[in-house]
UniProtKB/Swiss-Prot annotation:
Compartment list: Secreted
Its job: Has antibacterial activity.
Source organism of this protein record: Homo sapiens (Human)
Tissue: Specifically expressed in testis.
Name the UniProt record assigns to this protein: Beta-defensin 105
Cystines in this chain: C43-C74, C53-C67, C57-C73
Family to which this protein belongs: Belongs to the beta-defensin family.
Pfam family, one: Defensin_beta_2
InterPro entries for the chain: Beta_defensin_dom
One Gene Ontology biological process: innate immune response
Length: 78
């Protein structure tokens, strides 16, 4: 009986430790270096995934708000 209780507490503690770890997309994103295309990462999007955060929008994109610091939320022109 005591072994089952200890196993339960161990698994319960491990669950909460794993929950506290950030996901791969969020881990270190604030300190990541941007890619040459001007994007931070695939997971760095804005406007519900319809735009990308860039320093400058491409020719076929228009600025549609701000992401953070000096970055614009760029969306495709329609």
């Amino acid at each position: 009986m005591a072994l089952i209780r200890k196993t339960f507490y161990f698994l319960f503690a491990m669950f909460f430790i794993l929950v506290q770890l950030p996901s791969g997309c969020q881990a270190g994103l604030d300190f990541s270096q941007p890619f040459p295309s001007g994007e931070f990462a695939v997971c760095e999007s804005c406007k519900l995934g319809r735009g990308k955060c860039r320093k400058e929008c491409l020719e076929n994109e228009k600025p549609d708000g701000n992401c953070r610091l000096n970055f614009l939320c760029c969306r495709q022109r329609i």
